[in-house]
Amino acid sequence: MSKLPEYEQITTDEQLARFCGSLRGSDLLAFDTEFVSENCYRPQLCLVQVATRNKLALIDAISIKDLTPFWELIVNDVGVTIVHAAREEFLFCFRATGARPKELFDLQLVGGFIGMEYPAAYTTLVNQLTG
């Protein structure tokens, strides 16, 4: 079993620009967000968790006010974007860029297409597939 890479904690615009630059041309990128949607008109993005074949990162969306470089990366410069139940994530992306990722693999949708419970939490899908 291969060792997982160390994760990067990204808290500044400079770190974000450097990180996004290092991911350009990646064949795949998986991400998930944490946000607060209670008592607000639009959800407030707090954290973006990112994984590629050889990088892991946590992007502090509270410290970094403009995540446009990340959203532009997934729209223009990576292959497949892997997500789970990404409705809100793609609203963040669309608001920042006016576009969506070209190649999308949504685990929740795929689970539904192959006859699994829909909608289903990520943990539910993993438990059903791995026992």
Residue ranges and their predicted role:
Residues L4-F31, V36-G131:
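Conserved DEDDh/DEDDy metal-dependent 3′-5′ exonuclease domain
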